Amino acid sequence: MEGLQVLVRQAKVPVWLPWPLPTGWLVSGFTGAGDERTGTRGSAVALSGPNPLGGPADMLIIAEEPGVGLGAGLAGLPGLDPGDGFAACQPHATVKVAHHEAPLWLVESHGKAVFVGEVAASWLWLVLWPDTAGTLLVEPLPLRDLRDPAQELDLPFGALSPRLPA
């Protein structure tokens, strides 16, 4: 919990968390990207829980300034950003942020569902394993920025996610 509080204090981008958490889901890790000079310009929160279609599932929610590459790296995609043409069609999913819906587009990937959009002038990535866990986004997923003041959330923590670098 202390490490998450440090990330929240230092982050220049949102630290997103679905809230309320989907039923049975736990926070399973977090990380940031940046340096002492520029600060934390990317954040990722890992979650684990039941796949709506059966079996276990993992999810990473990443926020980053353009050009950081944390989302693409954690999604196993080339480059730093989602790439050209990712938003060339109707959105495939939405998230709810502060009573507004933000569109997300599916980015081609193998074995996982990768959704990308833009919220608060930052890239927002949702990466879900296996790809069938993407059904969690059939309805808009409500997200909260853990940097927002006056939040007393009792977060349930689980085992560390293997989806984040050690």
Regions found by a protein language model. Give the residues of each.
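Glycine-centered secondary-structure boundary/capping sites
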Residues: 10-14, 73-75, 121
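Proline-anchored loop/turn motifs at beta-strand termini and strand-loop-strand connectors
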Residues: 17-28
